[in-house]
């Protein structure tokens, strides 16, 4: 079919959106390169999978797949509210936190409005901005992370929404409690601030600012989190936002009916009751991060210190060629930018010890080959 058939009918701000490119699936790499062993370190997934309790809960509910889910996720909201020490009316659930990030843009911004986000930020922020016809204000990064002072200075009377991520994806950088408090105090009360904490469980920094602690003081703050990462429920697509009741009520007006499937609800409920699994996940991540960063240092490779479950390593102008060579070795990692200095980095998700070893052996082989000396 011709691509131009309906081009004139599509809204201009929609036709300009670049399609989000996820990490390559294992099956695609196996098919393309005829490989049996694959280590997927591209999508920041939990290498341990899901909690055994969550798996068991899902298995016990498979018989009910013919029924619609609870449209309000009543029991999950109750459990999540208890876990977070919030009220159920202060929580909105989404089909992945991506859905909620997009909904917030649809609720608060439109043509003529401005949405602020950082350079080197999660692609969904800019996509959501374009989708509602708003103007994206991308503030240059500082040391690969958010320049909060510059972001505060970028606020105008057209600003409706600000997206922040702490830790940031894809760079893994973190801003401190002091930096956060200085920033949020400068934001006008009519500007919505979305604080994306998808990787909060992995943080080890002593000066991390937990967004939940600021919700009462700042009614314009929305905290976004997910079950996809530390809880290992990426396949089931479930995330949540926490904010004051009024903001949550607007999100619930716009979210699709039955947006959280039944299996996701029961899995998330069970996952909340397995804190030891999350601890095991975080401990494994800490160990894996130490292993990879030590390897990079031994090889003389620069990397961005990360507070997530991934790390970006600088492989120079040949990074995309190295990425292709890694694929041929059965290792899937993630290029992070099409151009500029950041395009010389690859993002590596922390895997199981044997997956990390697979990556390091493959990269070492590539870097010592005649093609890359």
UniProtKB/Swiss-Prot annotation:
**Which GO biological-process labels does this protein carry?**
L-histidine biosynthetic process
**SUPFAM superfamilies attached to this UniProt entry:** PLP-dependent transferases
Q: What is its EC number?
A: 2.6.1.9
Q: List, separated by semicolons, the cofactors it needs.
A: pyridoxal 5'-phosphate
Q: Which reaction does it catalyse?
A: L-histidinol phosphate + 2-oxoglutarate = 3-(imidazol-4-yl)-2-oxopropyl phosphate + L-glutamate
Residue positions, PTM N6-(pyridoxal phosphate)lysine:
229
Q: Note the superkingdom of the native organism.
A: Bacteria
| Pathway connected to this protein | Amino-acid biosynthesis; L-histidine biosynthesis; L-histidine from 5-phospho-alpha-D-ribose 1-diphosphate: step 7/9
**Keywords carried by this UniProt record:** Amino-acid biosynthesis, Aminotransferase, Histidine biosynthesis, Pyridoxal phosphate, Transferase
Picking any one GO molecular function of the record gives: histidinol-phosphate transaminase activity
Cite the PROSITE patterns for this sequence. AA_TRANSFER_CLASS_2
Q: Which family does it belong to?
A: Belongs to the class-II pyridoxal-phosphate-dependent aminotransferase family. Histidinol-phosphate aminotransferase subfamily.
Listed under subunit, the entry gives: Homodimer.
The UniProt entry, under PANTHER family, shows: HISTIDINOL-PHOSPHATE AMINOTRANSFERASE, HISTIDINOL-PHOSPHATE AMINOTRANSFERASE 2
Q: What is this protein called?
A: Histidinol-phosphate aminotransferase 2
Q: What lineage does the source organism belong to?
A: Bacteria, Pseudomonadati, Pseudomonadota, Gammaproteobacteria, Thiotrichales
